[in-house]
Amino acid sequence: MNVLPVVGRFAPSPTGAMHLGNARTALLAWLHSRALGGLHLLRFEDLDTGRVRSWAYDTTRRDLEWLGLDWDAEFRQSERLPVYADAVSRLTAAGETYPCTCTRREIRQAIEDSAGAPHGHEPVYPGTCRLHGAMPGRPAALRWHVPDGTVCVTDALTCATLCQNLPAEVGDFVLRRNDGVYAYHLAVVVDDALMGVTDVVRGADLWTATPRQVALGRALGSAPPRYLHVPLMTDFRGERLAKRGGAPPLRALREGGEEAGRVLSALARSLGWAVPERVSAAELLPLWRAQLTRAGFFINPQS
């Protein structure tokens, strides 16, 4: 039986300069693809054009190259709008979408009026426009009517399992915003399927979004990839590094004369790996293989 080749990806948003947290995730995604002899893709998630910075594409490439991370193909989501439109058309033809004109304020008010409460950090949409129809004359988003039942996913790195009842814990979510921009969850699911991505290494902040992405992929006829969620890098206050929070850019280290080997060593040591003061990305490959072995990771020939 033939084993499908591993295809991994790093998918940054070009909304600013990469910081050390982005770099660590990029490193781990690259290590995973290369340690398993697979292909590695670079995909710019740039659908929200209002937040995109044109210089960030080249800066990101330079940062990755400086760290010794290569890739086999490059994509921009902004150049792939027809494939997202096709996915939306298929879901709509199946009767699984509906227009929604609710504002965030109206959604929160509806939840309060029904004596409900937000789950986690986001309110669960109560299905107002599905039940009562969209408001005429307003710009409308497009929501996916999530299927009934519970979706469970198991992380291939941590072996943790997460089960979510989508209607109760997530609610019908947006596929296309009311300004016409396709939503992250739609684009990432469509792209991973069409690009043949088998393994997704990404930050732990996306763990709770995984069940809805798996469900959406199934609705579009695609099998889910393996998901490996890695810890986020935090500052001295324990808060995650973020572009919006003013995390120092990797570019400043690169342009300031810092050695890439020292940065890679610091990233590796932040994961608890014992490495020299200077190390190359290639020299970290055995450590990632060992990490996978300890996690009981395996490749399912039938996946």
Curated annotation (Swiss-Prot):
Provide the E.C. number(s) assigned to this enzyme.
Answer: 6.1.1.-
**What Gene Ontology terms describe what this protein does at the molecular function level?**
ATP binding; glutamate-tRNA ligase activity; zinc ion binding
Binding-site residues, ATP: 243
Q: What are the binding positions for Zn(2+) in this chain?
A: 100, 102, 125, 129
How would you classify this enzyme at the top EC level? ligase
Query: Motif 'HIGH' region in this chain: where?
Result: 12-22
What GO biological process term is on the record, naming one?
tRNA modification
Tell me which UniProt keywords the record has, alphabetically.
Answer: Aminoacyl-tRNA synthetase, ATP-binding, Ligase, Metal-binding, Nucleotide-binding, Zinc
Cofactor(s) for this protein? Zn(2+)
Motif residue range(s): 'KMSKS' region: 240-244
Q: How is the cofactor bound?
A: Binds 1 zinc ion per subunit.
Q: Where does L-glutamate bind?
A: 9-13, 45, 184, 202
SUPFAM superfamilies on file? Nucleotidylyl transferase
Q: An example Gene Ontology cellular component term from the record? A: cytosol
Family annotation (PROSITE patterns):
AA_TRNA_LIGASE_I
User: What functional role does this protein have?
Assistant: Catalyzes the tRNA-independent activation of glutamate in presence of ATP and the subsequent transfer of glutamate onto a tRNA(Asp). Glutamate is transferred on the 2-amino-5-(4,5-dihydroxy-2-cyclopenten-1-yl) moiety of the queuosine in the wobble position of the QUC anticodon.
The family database entries (HAMAP family) matched by this protein are listed as: Glu_Q_tRNA_synth
- Family per record: Belongs to the class-I aminoacyl-tRNA synthetase family. GluQ subfamily.
- Name of the protein this chain belongs to: Glutamyl-Q tRNA(Asp) synthetase
Q: Which organism is it from?
A: Deinococcus geothermalis (strain DSM 11300 / CIP 105573 / AG-3a)
Source gene? Answer: gluQ
